[in-house]
Amino acid sequence: MQEGLKLAERYNASLGSSQTYPIDNHHDKESSTDVATDDIMEKDLHSGKTISSQNSLDGSEASTPVHQLERPTIDVSERNDSRRKFRKKTSLDDLLDQASKFQPQYEYSFPTSFLRKRKAPQSNESDGEEEAKQNRTNKIVKQKKTKKNVKVTSKSKASVPIEEKHTINKQPKKTGTGGMKRGPKPGRKKKSQKNTKNSIKKESTNAINNHKMYEMDSASSRFAEHKNSTNSESANNSFIDWSLPKFSPPYQIFDIDNINSYSNFQGQIYSSASLTKHHNEIGSKTPFSRNRDGSKSPIDDGQGKLIGLRSILYPDYYEEYLMDYKKVNFRYDGMAEIGKIMEYVGRIYLPEKYQKEYKETVVDIYNTAYDNKDLALSISTVEKYNQFVGSIPKAEIVNHLAATKELPRSFLHDFLQIVYTRSIHPYASKLKQYKAFSNYVYGELLPGFLTDVYSKCGLSKNHLFMDLGSGVGNCVIQASLEFGCRESFGCEIMEAASELTEIQMREYSNRCKLFGFKQSKIDYSLRKSFINNEKVESLIPECDVLLVNNFLFDGKLNYEVTKLLQKTKVGCKIISLKNIRASGYTLDTVNIESVLNRLEVKKYRLDNNSVSWTHNGGEYFISTVLDRIDESLLDPQKRDRRNTHRPAKYTR
């Protein structure tokens, strides 16, 4: 009897203070006796002991084996559920829950970001609530008023101190594409929601969806350099943000000898007028094109005028442009491209003594005509431009270029854009012929991101650059033009991308002659995989910077990439969108000779508008091949942190 009561008391104590079952020493209540008896039976069933029957609790000494007892018909699951309901969650339970969560590892892990992260909806609080919050904040921390602290008043009258260096400036007024921007495609149009709390998010979504009709256009995402203007005059009267810092090319970017060798342009290019006509023809399934005012008009209605834009280095050559302010094509704006070329010519090619007059009589007038959509004034200004550049002796221009030490990066990026629009736009539909979510999915890294990552790798004119999966060749061409690599090499297996690589290389070579750029060695291995490729295997040991866009590589292909990296030299930089060495990788006797043990991996933040397949940012990695084992693999603390890292959650 006493032993049973003690067991019942012990069981109640284990349940905690949230719920206990009463034990009546006088046995006045049958309910408490039943519960206590059942608890005792439940414990002793597992121990194999014999316990007293119901009569034993009343004083009888008769005992019965456990297997001969008749268990009361009590639903144990319901009783346990009720106990769990009131039971407090302990720290041990939290640890068990965390340990039970799924953790992806190795090649099945997904790279952080690139997909929209789930965020709590932003609620529009009342003015009174925000003011109350602000008052509480001001009581805790009092901001000192200095020159660096300025206050910006929001719509809700809540003032927030912001440092001057973080102030967002307006974008230059004329952001005409001058060609299709290889930015991300606008996302799908979201369904309307009744919840008004997400109004801020809806406005930004609608702003993106309004441009969905222009399939591959993103005027502001092609070059990050054009975004934050701090010069009010530049914002109103220029196609280019001249306030951005210039850079010094690591080599003599202008080919002075080649410019002096030819008086006439030796080459054939795809003209702007041909590109404009192409976009007008495919812009609609009907024989109509959309005008700037939203109306439609026949494509061949005779409006607009063909006009030639004179080359600054070869006065005998004119590139044809179709000028028409009535029709607008958001994939390519030839008239904005004219404005950019005029400004670059004045700042880069013309000697300083001509620049002031040129700006006043050509650049400023064309900008005014573009703003007012004055076709007649635009045409007359182009004619004035042709006369002006034709009157300057070529020798003075060449001497000025030879002494040039700095250039705006936007000049090189816009030049690459001109090449891209002429060679890729007419055949862009071919790039859609691939299997989704496979190793053959096509995607591009944009020039702004490439400039940043190449600079981090220290790419220079003495380096060999390689791109495994080079697509249409953009990364290879930019490494050659902007950094002057001694050799830039790309490998591409897809037929369509390989064909467009050849077209782009022809256009690039001819455009370099027209603009006077020096061409470094560029080579490709097209329509072939980089696996078991003799040319790739011969160049890998000499490679200084290697680019692998492994965002959608499967485990098998990643394994083949690792085998190739085994031959890389010490100091080689490897750029990737997913970590070459998986988060769960550990050093053991089996993989002791693997190159993955000698990789020093650094993760960087990928800004928005860095890749073609999404507007969102993410992360990328630069791995350096060491001559020793990476210390992070030997440090237990770092190893534990690496193995327990959980990627962020994602939404569609």
Swiss-Prot record:
Note: In contrast to other lysine histone methyltransferases, it does not contain a SET domain, suggesting the existence of another mechanism for methylation of lysine residues of histones.
GO molecular function: histone binding; histone H3K79 trimethyltransferase activity
InterPro entries in UniProt: Dot1, DOT1_dom, H3-K79_meTrfase, SAM-dependent_MTases_sf
Composition-biased stretches (Polar residues): 49-66
Record domain DOT1: where: 321-638
Sites where the protein binds S-adenosyl-L-methionine: 442-445, 465-474, 492, 529-530
Compositionally skewed regions (Basic residues) per UniProt: 139-150, 182-194
Keyword Repeat attributed: yes
EC numbers for this chain: 2.1.1.360
Gene that produces this protein: DOT1
Catalytic activity: L-lysyl(79)-[histone H3] + 3 S-adenosyl-L-methionine = N(6),N(6),N(6)-trimethyl-L-lysyl(79)-[histone H3] + 3 S-adenosyl-L-homocysteine + 3 H(+)
Regulation: Ubiquitination of histone H2B to form H2BK123ub1 is required for efficient DOT1 methyltransferase activity on histone H3.
Domain of life, source organism: Eukaryota
GO biological process: global genome nucleotide-excision repair; meiotic recombination checkpoint signaling; methylation; mitotic G1 DNA damage checkpoint signaling; mitotic intra-S DNA damage checkpoint signaling; negative regulation of heterochromatin formation; nucleosome assembly; postreplication repair
Region span, Disordered: 15-90, 112-211, 281-300
The organism of origin for this protein: Candida glabrata (strain ATCC 2001 / BCRC 20586 / JCM 3761 / NBRC 0622 / NRRL Y-65 / CBS 138) (Yeast)
SUPFAM superfamilies for this protein: S-adenosyl-L-methionine-dependent methyltransferases
Disulfide links within the chain: none
Protein name, entry field: Histone-lysine N-methyltransferase, H3 lysine-79 specific
Keyword entries, A-Z: Chromatin regulator, Methyltransferase, Nucleus, Repeat, S-adenosyl-L-methionine, Transcription, Transcription regulation, Transferase
GO cellular component, one term: chromosome, telomeric region
